[in-house]
Each structure stands twice: as C-alpha cells, then as structure tokens.
UniProtKB/Swiss-Prot annotation:
Organism this protein belongs to: Odorrana ishikawae
Biological role: Has antimicrobial activity against Gram-negative bacterium E.coli ATCC 8739 (MIC=50 ug) and against Gram positive bacteria S.aureus ATCC 6538 (MIC=25 ug). Has no activity against methicillin-resistant S.aureus ATCC 43300, B.subtilis ATCC 6633 and against fungus C.albicans ATCC 90028.
Entry keyword set: Amphibian defense peptide, Antibiotic, Antimicrobial, Cleavage on pair of basic residues, Disulfide bond, Secreted, Signal
InterPro entries attached to this UniProt entry: Antimicrobial_frog_2, Frog_antimicrobial_propeptide
Expression by tissue: Expressed by the skin glands.
The family this protein is said to belong to: Belongs to the frog skin active peptide (FSAP) family. Brevinin subfamily.
Keyword Glycosyltransferase: no
Pfam families in UniProt: Antimicrobial_2, FSAP_sig_propep
Positions of the propeptide segment: 23-40
Signal peptide as annotated in the record: 1-22
Protein name: Brevinin-2ISc
Length: 75
C-alpha cells in the first residue's frame, strides 16, 4: 500500500510540473504574438515615414533646382 501511495504521489508531482511547463510555454507563445503585432505596426509606420521623407526630399530638390535656374537666368 505504501508503494502505491508513493507511486501516485510521484505521478501527481510529475503531472503538476509538466502542466506548469505547458502553461509557461502557452504564455510565452501569446507574448510572442503580441510582439509580432507591435513589430508590424512599427514596420508600417517606418515605411510611411520613409515614403514621406523621400517625397519631401524630391520636392525640395525640385524647388532648389527651379530657384537656382531662375537666379542664374539659365532657364
């Protein structure tokens, strides 16, 4: 009887540990999913920012070209 109780106690202990590890992995997976959404938002904002900077540089370059042309009367 004592051996049976010992075995059941050992099984209960091992089951509790494995359940705890599974819950930790599940929590870690959920956290990784949140980071992915955050990274997507950052990449979209980064792309929009890069496009706006490129458009601003292009507009500034065309304005400067026009001004230099008019100032030097070479248009």
């Amino acid at each position: 009887m004592f051996t049976l109780k010992k075995s059941l106690l050992l099984l209960f202990f091992l089951g509790t540990i494995s359940l705890s590890l599974c819950e930790e992995e599940r929590d870690a997976d959920e956290d990784e999913g949140e980071m992915t959404e955050e990274e997507v938002k950052r990449s979209v904002l980064g792309t929009v920012k890069d496009l706006l900077i490129g458009a601003g540089k292009s507009a500034a370059q065309s304005v400067l070209t026009t001004l230099s042309c008019k100032l030097s009367n070479s248009c």
